[in-house]
């Protein structure tokens, strides 16, 4: 199994990326959310991958975060939901939004995904609700090259601190996202916790 690819970004389109890894070129299918975070060509990039292997299909799918990959893999485990539909879902909404819509049974939102009708939405709600309930889907929306490690570490530490202070994981994630939308440069977990607590009380 290919768990990730890390190398030089040679080419990118809205649904794929070509990554050179020591002279080997890997064509990786990506959702729109990952495409938007890809660096310029000739820069280094790392993608978390899922190797889809069937008798009539062998493809590599790449994601900016492990959460996206987990959601993709979980969705492809649903009856009659293939990688194309799972990729379409992650192109239409974030892992957090997808999880929330499934947990809330929001069929009107789910049917906005290309290829998802009412019956498929019902199936997604029934089969994904338990699987996604405890999924940590806090997103890192920073670019996929350079400078994101400190920010990602601060988010993870802040999430842990906020849940220890009594917030639910969903509320903590929501507060952190709200803070980072208004203060994208924060890289201190302490500052993030302080502002997130304030946001949660407003």
From Swiss-Prot:
Homotetramer. Forms an RuvA(8)-RuvB(12)-Holliday junction (HJ) complex. HJ DNA is sandwiched between 2 RuvA tetramers; dsDNA enters through RuvA and exits via RuvB. An RuvB hexamer assembles on each DNA strand where it exits the tetramer. Each RuvB hexamer is contacted by two RuvA subunits (via domain III) on 2 adjacent RuvB subunits; this complex drives branch migration. In the full resolvosome a probable DNA-RuvA(4)-RuvB(12)-RuvC(2) complex forms which resolves the HJ. The keyword DNA-binding applies. It is found in: Cytoplasm. Has three domains with a flexible linker between the domains II and III and assumes an 'L' shape. Domain III is highly mobile and contacts RuvB. Residues 65-143 are annotated as: Domain II. Keywords: Cytoplasm, DNA damage, DNA recombination, DNA repair, DNA-binding. SUPFAM superfamilies: DNA helicase RuvA subunit, C-terminal domain (SSF46929), Nucleic acid-binding proteins (SSF50249), RuvA domain 2-like (SSF47781). One of its GO terms (biological process) is DNA repair. Residues 144-149 are annotated as: Flexible linker. Belongs to the RuvA family. InterPro entries: DNA_helicase_Holl-junc_RuvA_I, Hlx-hairpin-Hlx_DNA-bd_motif, NA-bd_OB-fold, RuvA, RuvA_2-like, RuvA_C, RuvA_C_sf. GO terms for molecular function: ATP binding; four-way junction DNA binding; four-way junction helicase activity. Residues 1-64 are annotated as: Domain I. It comes from Salinibacter ruber (strain DSM 13855 / M31). This is Holliday junction branch migration complex subunit RuvA. One of its GO terms (cellular component) is Holliday junction helicase complex.
């Amino acid at each position: 199994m290919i768990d990730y690819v890390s190398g030089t970004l040679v080419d990118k389109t809205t649904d794929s990326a070509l990554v050179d890894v020591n002279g080997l070129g890997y064509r990786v299918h990506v959702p729109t959310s990952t495409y938007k975070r890809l660096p310029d060509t000739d820069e280094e990039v790392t993608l978390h991958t899922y190797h889809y292997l069937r008798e009539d299909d062998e493809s590599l799918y790449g994601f900016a975060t492990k959460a996206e990959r987990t959601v993709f893999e979980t969705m492809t485990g649903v009856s009659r939901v293939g990688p194309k539909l799972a990729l379409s879902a992650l192109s239409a909404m974030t892992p957090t939004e997808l999880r929330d819509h499934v947990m809330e049974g929001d069929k009107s939102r789910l049917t906005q995904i290309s290829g998802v009708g009412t019956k498929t939405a019902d199936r997604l709600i029934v089969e994904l609700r338990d699987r996604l309930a405890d999924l940590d889907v806090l997103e890192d929306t920073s670019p996929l090259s350079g400078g994101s490690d400190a920010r990602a570490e601060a988010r993870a530490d802040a999430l842990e601190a906020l849940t220890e202070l009594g917030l639910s994981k969903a509320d903590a994630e929501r507060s952190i996202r709200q803070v980072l939308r208004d203060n994208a440069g924060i890289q201190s977990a302490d500052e993030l916790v302080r502002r997130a607590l304030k946001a949660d009380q407003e």
